[in-house]
């Protein structure tokens, strides 16, 4: 079922839903550059004001996945995971999700991380990996080779979503959050079936776990720290939406339930990508402090999402062992060295 841009705009103004098939059609038009910048901005604003529905987000993500340049990672996919955040939480912490992938891969998971440069933070995942010396400008085949060899592949979002070129100038000029801010984490080009997904707003926990269910995901934990972080937090309880065995559940976890001390996110803030690198490496080198503890907490949840352990508690125990033994730091070095064989810094 098709819908014109004008009809879609009218629908959003009236706070009515754009149905799934209509949203598929609309997104294909927008991504093909068939909708003018003015109408695109108006529709994106209308969706934001009325609040995007599960169906609208699912349809938009479906189109983004269709158009993405894929990374083909051979099975098995039981322990294949993305650890990703929407960003936009304004916390300016070091790159926690990037540190987490090295612990997760050291445990035997395969991680296909989908990320970008910083928009609002001091250091996006692409910035963090480049600061660590990794070459992130790889072809899809090279990314797949990285995953096979090291257990980690990084997919630089602009390299895999070329259709975004028709939307990027509009988003840049608008300068406000739109549906595209939440589509990135839903559109992993390698199709990782398991995900630890951090979100910037509590309302997104229940919404995005149900979107991931509709998109056919396997095991997903969508998290939001009640102190505002788009990570599993040490500073407050963390809301969790979990998809497992086809069932969705929602609950809260608290650091003290796992024997972890509470620490405010201000203790994890950094000024730039270089400081983020130093803090990240220190955490993986088992230097005591809040950075190490939050990486262990997030990695524990990621190991559970990757089906390597049966509980978050067991994941935290395993993550602590991997950091203490040096395995996580060794995985970082292995990954960086492997990417550099393709050229780059």
Swiss-Prot record:
This is Anthranilate phosphoribosyltransferase. Pfam families: Glycos_trans_3N, Glycos_transf_3. It comes from the Bacteria. One of its GO terms (biological process) is L-tryptophan biosynthetic process. Mg(2+) 1 binds at residues 97, 231. Anthranilate 1 binds at residues 85, 116. GO terms for molecular function: anthranilate phosphoribosyltransferase activity; magnesium ion binding. Keywords: Amino-acid biosynthesis, Aromatic amino acid biosynthesis, Glycosyltransferase, Magnesium, Metal-binding, Transferase, Tryptophan biosynthesis. Binds 2 magnesium ions per monomer. Mg(2+) 2 binds at residues 230-231. Anthranilate 2 binds at residue 171. The gene is trpD.
């Amino acid at each position: 079922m098709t819908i014109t841009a004008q009809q879609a705009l009218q629908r959003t103004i009236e706070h009515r839903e754009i149905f799934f098939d209509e949203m598929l059609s609309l997104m294909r038009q927008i991504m093909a550059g068939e909708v003018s910048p003015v109408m695109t901005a108006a529709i994106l604003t209308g969706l934001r004001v009325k609040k995007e529905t599960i169906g609208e987000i699912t349809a938009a993500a479906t189109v983004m996945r269709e158009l993405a340049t894929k990374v083909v990672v051979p099975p098995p996919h039981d322990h294949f995971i993305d650890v990703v955040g929407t960003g936009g939480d304004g916390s300016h912490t070091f790159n926690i999700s990037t540190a987490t992938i090295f612990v997760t891969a050291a445990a035997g998971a395969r991680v296909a991380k989908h990320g970008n440069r910083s928009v609002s933070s001091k250091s996006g995942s692409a910035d963090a990996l480049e600061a660590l010396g990794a070459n992130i400008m790889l072809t899809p085949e090279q990314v797949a080779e990285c995953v096979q060899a090291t257990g980690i592949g990084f997919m630089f979002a602009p390299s895999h979503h070329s259709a975004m070129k028709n939307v990027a100038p509009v988003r840049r000029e608008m300068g406000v959050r739109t549906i595209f801010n939440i589509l990135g984490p839903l559109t992993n080009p390698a199709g990782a079936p398991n995900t630890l997904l951090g979100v910037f707003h509590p309302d997104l926990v229940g919404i995005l776990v149900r979107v991931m269910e509709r998109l056919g995901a396997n095991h997903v934990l969508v998290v939001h720290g009640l102190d505002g972080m788009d990570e599993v937090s040490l500073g407050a309880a963390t809301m969790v939406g979990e998809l497992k065995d086809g069932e969705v559940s929602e609950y809260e976890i608290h650091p003290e339930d796992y024997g972890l001390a509470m620490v405010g996110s201000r203790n994890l803030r950094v000024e730039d990508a270089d400081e983020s690198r130093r803090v990240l490496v220190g955490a993986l080198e088992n230097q005591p402090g809040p950075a190490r503890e939050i990486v262990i907490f997030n990695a524990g949840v990621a190991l559970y999402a990757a089906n390597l352990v049966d509980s978050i508690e067991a994941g935290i125990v395993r993550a602590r062992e991997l950091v203490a033994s040096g395995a996580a730091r060794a995985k970082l070095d292995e990954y960086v060295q492997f990417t550099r064989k393709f050229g780059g810094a």
